[in-house]
Amino acid sequence: MRVYLGSDHAGFELKQQIIAHLEQSGHQPIDCGAFSYDADDDYPAFCIAAATRTVADPDSLGIVLGGSGNGEQIAANKVPGARCALAWSVETAQLAREHNNAQLIGIGGRMHTVAEALAIVDAFVTTPWSKAPRHQRRIDILAEYERTHQAPPVPGAVG
């Protein structure tokens, strides 16, 4: 599987570890930057690049990394069609795939040991999308909002 990766300085070392792990696992990691350590770099360009390439390649996944994974997830989700979940455990990585058909996850490089992060990555890349109708319905609602910017009706709301 192709896996696009983007990180800033805070996720740079972990990204290198993940790339090596993915290669050893038979995957095709594609580095979208940062390409060298720069303590003053900014995450948006790297995360948007990884998300753009992931969305354009339907059979791929993506991983964005920074200090917490929060800003990186936000940046990736600015790309139309991207569904990036913050994964902080094996379970959240699995649920991102099963329930949300997330194509990307954000991981905090300062939040996990290398072993923990690799377990999250493995869970993400090996967990299939459930294709459950209730989950697809929710994805469709979000896609329609993204397309039209018209919020769905709030069930039970008056007026």
From Swiss-Prot:
Keywords recorded for this protein, A-Z: Carbohydrate metabolism, Isomerase
Superkingdom field: Bacteria
UniProt binding sites for D-ribulose 5-phosphate: D8, H9, G67, S68, G69, N70, G71, N100, R110, R134, R138
Active site: E72, H99
InterPro entries, per database record: Rib-5-P_Isoase_Actino, RpiB_LacA_LacB, RpiB_LacA_LacB_sf
Presence of the UniProt keyword Isomerase in the record: yes
GO biological process: D-allose catabolic process; pentose-phosphate shunt, non-oxidative branch
Catalyzed chemical reaction(s): aldehydo-D-ribose 5-phosphate = D-ribulose 5-phosphate
UniProt-listed Gene3D superfamilies: Sugar-phosphate isomerase, RpiB/LacA/LacB
Pathway given in the UniProt record: Carbohydrate degradation; pentose phosphate pathway; D-ribose 5-phosphate from D-ribulose 5-phosphate (non-oxidative stage): step 1/1
EC number(s) recorded for this UniProt protein: 5.3.1.6
Quaternary structure note: Homodimer.
Function: Catalyzes the interconversion of ribulose-5-P and ribose-5-P.
Family recorded in the similarity comment: Belongs to the LacAB/RpiB family.
Miscellaneous comment text of the record: In mycobacterial enzymes, the usual proton acceptor is not a cysteine, but is remplaced by a glutamate.
Protein name: Ribose-5-phosphate isomerase B
Native source species: Mycolicibacterium paratuberculosis (strain ATCC BAA-968 / K-10) (Mycobacterium paratuberculosis)
Gene that produces this protein: rpiB
